[in-house]
Amino acid sequence: MKDIILGTTGIQVRQNEFGALTIQRVEIPESVKILRKAYDGGIKFFDTARAYSDSEVKLGEALSIYPRESYYLASKTMAKTPEEFKAQLETSLTNLKTDYIDIFQFHCANQVFKPNDGTGMYECMLEAKAAGKIRHIGITAHKLQIAMDAIDSGLYETLQFPFSYLSSDKELKLVEKCKENNMGFIAMKGLAGGLINKSEVAMAYMTQFDNVLPIWGVQKEKELDEWLSYMETTPVLSDEIKAYIENEKKELAGDFCRGCGYCMPCPAGIMINQCARMSLM
């Protein structure tokens, strides 16, 4: 398994890391067991968010027994005001049992915050960084134009965006643009919200990019075992796998539900995400 350097952050980890959204669905004892097994197996980058209920708490419980400099924490805030930002950052630090977060990200951004834009939000990031509470400033997005604007701004060190072998050519260009600008690219939804069911194919696809860091959602020990097995024997993007991917693209690519749930709640009470995924059945 090769290493990835996340742009100007200088963070260097294996190209096979942990997305902690799904860990919120697991009871604390089991989640702690999974997280510590991940760490012991070579996973050293863990991505979470203030919005992921008790995910941060579980990470703090599991990882605080290890030297802090031996792993990286990325978290996120959906705050809309400086007051919310500061409160959420302090909560995240407490939950994670740490005095700093390696990458703090604006979560599911609908705008690219900038200095002097009147919101005070980017200034909050700068203040937190100056105070040593965060090390690097990142942004996560689900909209292509927001992601492009974030790269063009030159204000963010990392971009987190949905990316898998079902991604479009436009999303591939996003990866290329991040590389050109030495901006770290964190790939969420590497299994396309569950549409992709062969982890070895998903992993093999990612290995062709030297600037993409996939974070895999894990909630069962047997799932973790699959990802850890790739640390020693990394899947290769063979002609057979390429052909499989092309066939999958023909059947599944295009507009589809990744299962993120950010379309919810619906004011009319409609389960939008469930309806969207039923259309694929």
Q: What residues fall within each predicted segment?
A:
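Short beta->alpha linker loops
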Residues: 50, 54, 77-80, 107, ...
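Structured C-terminal cap/extension of enzyme domains
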Residues: 4, 39, 43-44, 173-187, ...
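N-terminal binding-site loop/beta-alpha segment at the start of enzyme catalytic domains
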Residues: 1-71
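Glycine/proline-rich, positively charged
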Residues: 26-29, 36, 40, 80-186, ...
